[in-house]
């Protein structure tokens, strides 16, 4: 009887293990579910084909309307809208007016239209592009003018190099002039000549008063000579 009881107790843990295995298997299934969700997200959906409008672009329609209206002060948005509706009524969308306003603003920002007091004109053709190309050609001529300047700059150092020997020649002349400075006794001889020159005018000055005195002396001897002759005549009479 003890052996039968032991045999009856053995299958009990096997049932528990089976129950644990049954519990573990459903827990693994939710882990696979997110992978399937990722696979669904990665698959791209079919793209909707773009509907090509039957009417021309808004830039073409607006420019055509302004050119056809030919208004001096420009065409208003209402006049432009009426012209486009009359020509392309069957192909325009229901929100045509709103799209037209936004497209006109974009054309003004791009410089294709000019706004004048609530009306719009076609922008003038860029005629200023040609003068810009002419100005670009002028700077190309400047490097040519710089090339001769470099030649002259190269020649000027050669001239300076040639001028340096000339500067040395005056230095030699100064070296020759130094012996003249040594001959200072000649400079001492000059004062003697000056002293002699001073003596000459000093001697000339006494001659002037001597020249004045002789006339007075001459006048006196003439008077004395006359009475001397008279006694001589008396002797002749005797």
Swiss-Prot record:
The keyword Mitochondrion does not apply. Residues 133-197 have a biased composition (Basic residues). InterPro entries: H1/H5, Histone_H1/H5_H15, SMH1-6, WH-like_DNA-bd_sf, WH_DNA-bd_sf. GO terms for biological process: chromosome condensation; negative regulation of DNA recombination; nucleosome assembly. Residues 54-124 form the H15 domain. It is found in: Nucleus; Chromosome. One of its GO terms (molecular function) is double-stranded DNA binding. The keyword Acyltransferase does not apply. Residues 21-34, 123-132, 198-208, 217-230 have a biased composition (Low complexity). It holds the Pfam family Linker_histone. Its main location: nucleus. Gene3D superfamilies: Winged helix-like DNA-binding domain superfamily/Winged helix DNA-binding domain. GO terms for cellular component: nucleosome; nucleus. Residues 21-57, 123-238 are annotated as: Disordered. Keywords: Chromosome, DNA-binding, Nucleus. PANTHER family: SINGLE MYB HISTONE 4 (PTHR46267), WINGED HELIX-TURN-HELIX TRANSCRIPTION REPRESSOR DNA-BINDING PROTEIN-RELATED (PTHR46267:SF15). Histones H1 are necessary for the condensation of nucleosome chains into higher-order structures. Belongs to the histone H1/H5 family. This is Histone H1. The lineage of its organism: Eukaryota, Viridiplantae, Streptophyta, Embryophyta, Tracheophyta.
């Amino acid at each position: 009887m003890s052996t039968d009881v032991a045999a009856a107790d053995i299958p009990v843990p096997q049932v528990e293990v089976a129950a644990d295995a049954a519990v573990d298997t459903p827990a693994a299934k939710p882990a696979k579910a997110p992978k399937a969700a990722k696979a669904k997200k990665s698959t791209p959906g079919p793209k909707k084909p773009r509907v090509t409008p039957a009417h021309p672009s808004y830039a073409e329609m607006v420019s055509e309307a302004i050119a056809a209206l030919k208004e001096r002060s420009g065409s208003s948005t209402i006049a432009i809208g009426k012209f486009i509706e009359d020509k392309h009524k069957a192909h325009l969308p229901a929100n045509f007016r709103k799209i037209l306003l936004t497209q006109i603003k974009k054309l003004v920002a791009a410089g294709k239209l000019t706004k004048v007091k609530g009306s719009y004109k076609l922008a003038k053709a860029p005629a200023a592009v040609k003068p810009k190309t002419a100005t670009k050609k002028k700077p190309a001529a400047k490097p040519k003018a710089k090339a001769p300047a470099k030649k002259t700059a190269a020649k000027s150092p050669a001239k300076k190099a040639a001028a340096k020997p000339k500067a040395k020649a005056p230095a030699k002349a100064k070296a020759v002039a130094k012996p003249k400075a040594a001959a200072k006794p000649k400079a001492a001889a000059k004062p003697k000549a000056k002293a002699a020159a001073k003596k000459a005018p000093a001697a000339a000055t006494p001659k002037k008063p001597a020249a004045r005195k002789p006339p007075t002396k001459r006048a006196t001897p003439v008077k004395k000579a006359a009475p001397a002759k008279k006694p001589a005549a008396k002797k002749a009479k005797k």
